[in-house]
């Protein structure tokens, strides 16, 4: 039987020890984890193969099976990512926002770890190391709860991590995993606020909703949302098409992939056939409003395009597949209103008008807003953060890609010369 109280106590104790470590000690531990993953890859891959075999027997969709799968190349990449985290600047201990007050008090903020992070994720065994490495570098202990379909993979990987931590002189309990498939344990973890300081869910809408509805621990919500690109008549059409193809096709299952394409009416008759032909080459299904459908149905070559009329629900749908909704708008105001209703994750405008670009960036409320760039850039690695634990759509604590700095908080430090308050 899993004793969550004991797991929480051990994590809290480990967090206190981690907060005192030097950057060199943390980096050495991360490199030891990377070495351990490669040295013990046979054990990890065997555990993963058993998980994958069960998933295939159970009829799990191929896309999810592929997400579950670890190979020597993928494991080497995970180890490389761990080393990359070791090479990143350490945010812990950073001094900022210095000021001296009229009272003589010298005041500043020092960046400190959050404490204990709970991570709940689905069929993504790579997340085990991704989150553990980032939490450790930021001085946090972490309690991992992977999906039951990757339980063996998580157990084997966590065992390797714990051994590496011990060898590096760190508490082995700095990274713990809950392997029991009982979902009630997830509910209990979400309410373990005596020990856990933050919950990060990584998965679908159902998981995020479950966490928000059941947690007393603060939850970072993210990784979901409808992403838009709005094309203006002033855009360079020839250069805009590859941006849209990249946003939709490069990784359609990603949360920052394009879902809805908004095209200004003055650009539609010229631009839509260009982008439809390009997307069709990649097998993208085009779900069009009536006006867009009429334009495309009359365009040369439309027989080869997968055109379908859009339903009202398509414009609020995160497809996570080779599907895009297309809507014609009469103005930037209409585009902004549409994005305000359905968007909030990754939003972009393709335009040659700096006034429109400035207005778009000021008025769109999203985790990231781009001008003449793909929505796929909304990513910790692309932002130069090294890696991320999630893309937060929260407004409080962190928003957008959560890297090392977002896994810390700060303490006010006040220094005086035996000062008393007047």
From Swiss-Prot:
Enzyme class: oxidoreductase
Pathway: Amino-acid biosynthesis; L-proline biosynthesis; L-glutamate 5-semialdehyde from L-glutamate: step 2/2
Family: Belongs to the gamma-glutamyl phosphate reductase family.
Annotated Pfam families: Aldedh
EC numbers: 1.2.1.41
Statement: the UniProt record of this protein carries the keyword NADP: yes
Listed PROSITE patterns: PROA
Compartments where located: Cytoplasm
Source organism per UniProt: Chloroflexus aurantiacus (strain ATCC 29366 / DSM 635 / J-10-fl)
A GO biological process held by the record: L-proline biosynthetic process
Gene Ontology MF: a single term: NADP binding
Record-linked InterPro entries: Ald_DH/histidinol_DH, Ald_DH_C, Ald_DH_N, Aldehyde_DH_dom, G-glutamylP_reductase_CS, Glu-5-SA_DH, GPR_dom
Alphabetically ordered keywords of this record: Amino-acid biosynthesis, Cytoplasm, NADP, Oxidoreductase, Proline biosynthesis
Record protein name field: Gamma-glutamyl phosphate reductase
A cellular component annotation (GO) from this entry: cytoplasm
Primary location recorded for the protein, binned into one broad class: cytoplasm
Catalytic activity: L-glutamate 5-semialdehyde + phosphate + NADP(+) = L-glutamyl 5-phosphate + NADPH + H(+)
Purpose of the protein: Catalyzes the NADPH-dependent reduction of L-glutamate 5-phosphate into L-glutamate 5-semialdehyde and phosphate. The product spontaneously undergoes cyclization to form 1-pyrroline-5-carboxylate.
């Amino acid at each position: 039987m899993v004793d969550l109280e004991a797991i929480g106590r051990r994590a809290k104790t480990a967090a206190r020890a981690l907060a005192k470590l030097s950057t060199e000690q943390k980096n050495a531990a991360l490199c030891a984890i990377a070495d351990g993953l490669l040295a013990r890859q046979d054990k990890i891959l065997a555990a993963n193969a058993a998980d994958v075999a069960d998933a295939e027997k159970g009829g799990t969709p191929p896309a999810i099976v592929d997400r579950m799968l670890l190979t020597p190349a993928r494991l080497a990449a995970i180890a490389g990512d761990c080393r990359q985290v070791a090479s990143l600047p350490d945010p812990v201990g950073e001094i900022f926002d210095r000021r001296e007050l009229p009272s003589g008090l010298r005041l500043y903020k020092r960046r400190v770890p959050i404490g204990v992070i709970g991570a709940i994720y689905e069929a993504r065994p790579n997340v085990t190391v991704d989150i553990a490495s980032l939490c450790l570098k930021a001085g946090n202990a972490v309690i991992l709860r992977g999906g039951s379909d990757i339980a063996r993979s998580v157990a084997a990987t966590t065992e390797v991590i714990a051994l590496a931590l011990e060898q590096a002189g760190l508490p082995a309990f700095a990274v713990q995993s809950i392997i029991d498939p009982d979902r009630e344990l997830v509910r209990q973890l979400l309410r373990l606020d005596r020990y856990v300081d933050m919950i990060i869910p990584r998965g679908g809408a159902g998981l995020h909703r479950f966490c928000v509805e059941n947690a007393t621990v603060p939850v970072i919500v993210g990784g979901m949302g409808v992403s838009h690109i709005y094309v203006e008549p002033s855009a360079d059409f020839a250069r805009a098409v590859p941006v849209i193809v990249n946003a939709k096709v490069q990784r359609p299952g990603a949360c920052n992939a394009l879902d809805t394409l908004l095209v200004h009416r003055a650009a539609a008759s010229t631009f839509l056939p260009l982008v439809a032909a390009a997307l069709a080459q990649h097998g993208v299904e085009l779900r069009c409003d009536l006006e867009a459908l009429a334009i495309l149905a009359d365009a040369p070559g439309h027989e080869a395009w997968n055109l379908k009329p859009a339903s009202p629900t398509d414009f609020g749908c995160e497809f996570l597949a080779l599907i895009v909704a297309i809507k014609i708008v009469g103005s930037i105001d209409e585009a902004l209103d549409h994005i305000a209703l359905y968007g909030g994750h990754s939003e972009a405008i393709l335009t040659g008008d700096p006034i429109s670009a400035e207005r778009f960036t000021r008025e769109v409320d999203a985790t990231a807003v781009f001008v003449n760039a793909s929505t796929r850039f909304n990513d910790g690695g692309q932002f130069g953060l090294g890696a991320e634990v999630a893309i937060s759509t929260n407004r409080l604590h962190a928003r957008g890609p959560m890297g090392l700095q977002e896994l810390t908080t700060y303490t006010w430090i006040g220094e005086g010369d035996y000062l008393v308050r007047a």
